[in-house]
Amino acid sequence: MMMASKDAPQSADGASGAGQLVPEVNTADPLPMEPVAGPTTAVATAGQVNMIDPWIVNNFVQSPQGEFTISPNNTPGDILFDLQLGPHLNPFLSHLSQMYNGWVGNMRVRILLAGNAFSAGKIIVCCVPPGFTSSSLTIAQATLFPHVIADVRTLEPIEMPLEDVRNVLYHTNDNQPTMRLVCMLYTPLRTGGGSGNSDSFVVAGRVLTAPSSDFSFLFLVPPTIEQKTRAFTVPNIPLQTLSNSRFPSLIQGMILSPDASQVVQFQNGRCLIDGQLLGTTPATSGQLFRVRGKINQGARTLNLTEVDGKPFMAFDSPAPVGFPDFGKCDWHMRISKTPNNTGSGDPMRSVSVQTNVQGFVPHLGSIQFDEVFNHPTGDYIGTIEWISQPSTPPGTDINLWEIPDYGSSLSQAANLAPPVFPPGFGEALVYFVSAFPGPNNRSAPNDVPCLLPQEYITHFVSEQAPTMGDAALLHYVDPDTNRNLGEFKLYPGGYLTCVPNGVGAGPQQLPLNGVFLFVSWVSRFYQLKPVGTASTARGRLGVRRI
């Protein structure tokens, strides 16, 4: 920045320096937000030329997390959406923000509701400045902020400004606190007789955004090696051809019921949707449900190794990668020596393992056979052929919803995948099940539930697409009719949820030839439609109950 000064020194020829341009004494250097290529590369552009196209400023577009729903199950005070001011609220600004290190300015918001004459209720939309926790606000406190109260029957869009209240000159692209747009249910949603089943009746809404004329970006990012951001996708494979992620078998059904266990801690089939593996989950089915280790003839203890033969580092993980996570049952295994150098005969050896005895400590690197191993010393690998009721205590039935004690106690095992539970209101976990051979006290199939198909885990590990929202909205579509059979949420923790249609009527069943399709990113407050109500042609789509 240059300035004129009367105190400027005289030039060499004696002329006064007044009126000449001289450098300012306290010139601030550009902040190196990222490695810069030169002093002129990362300079502020605010107040100069706004590089945002006028079309972007003049047109509203749907926010990436701008879908929300209101149902009679919501109560006053429930948060319908909670959006933070930033370039990520607008797809165009989100793309442009990758070229800059900072941003500043306001945005305009337009809210659309699917109004109709068969519903009544009001919502409140407020702007919560930084420093307030939006999740703890009451309805009365929400009215203290700039707000709009609207009827769900309104046909006109609701428009309001989202001001950039800040105590800094500009915002960097990291996640700094900014103004939040919060929508709550103000009065209960009530439906008339024309709406049919009120449990399945919801009012859908959309949030659209556009930058204000004062919105601008600052500090250009220096040119770097071109990088491509992968878009989030799910495998386009029918469910009937996918496999269980806790043991190798085709998926035989889905459990969609609130009566099923809603808190589980499986260690196989656990993967974040950005590709990070949890627990003992392998990336492919080649290592799944396998046990490998070394044992001496006449001994009972199998010293565990990884499936590929590498040493297992005790205390670093609950068990080797791919180690079975079946708890509350006895394992009956078939193992063979590797490499197999027998000239003839059956190389397989039958052994049994109890998972609730003191010798079962895979976290420490060993498990114990029920009987002495009277076969040659060596390196053995195998898998579980069938399971039975626990030997101790007698009379206990098989429970494949629980995991074994990996150490002397479950709390001693390190790096366990955390338990999961449905975070949304009225939601239930979705399980994919396959039957495993073995007797039980119920004289029924031993259904093994898992949270994700194995092909989904391999896909997420391969793609490693970034997570762009609180949850991914999936539709389960019948490929023959192209009809939507239900809405599901896929959370970043690697599990699906749905809203079962009815309570106490038994688990719902969907046809296994369907395909999950990614629709959009939604807020965790998004209210799912009950399964089976996304289309009026439920009878022809194969939705049925048992």
UniProtKB/Swiss-Prot annotation:
Region of interest: Shell domain: 1-226
Positions of region (Protruding domain): 227-545
Gene3D superfamilies noted in UniProt: 2.60.120.20, Positive stranded ssRNA viruses
Entry GO terms, CC: host cell cytoplasm; T=3 icosahedral viral capsid
Keywords of this entry: Capsid protein, Host cytoplasm, T=3 icosahedral capsid protein, Virion
Region named P1 sub-domain 2: 417-546
Chain intervals for the UniProt region annotation (Plays a role in binding to host histo-blood group structures antigens and in the formation of P-particles): 538-545
Chain residue ranges for the region called Disordered: 1-38
Positions of the record's site feature: Cleavage: K228, T229
P1 sub-domain 1, as annotated region: 227-279
Entry keyword Ribonucleoprotein: no
P2 sub-domain: annotated span: 280-416
Similarity comment text for this entry: Belongs to the caliciviridae capsid protein family.
Designated name of the protein: Capsid protein VP1
Lineage of the organism: Viruses, Riboviria, Orthornavirae, Pisuviricota, Pisoniviricetes
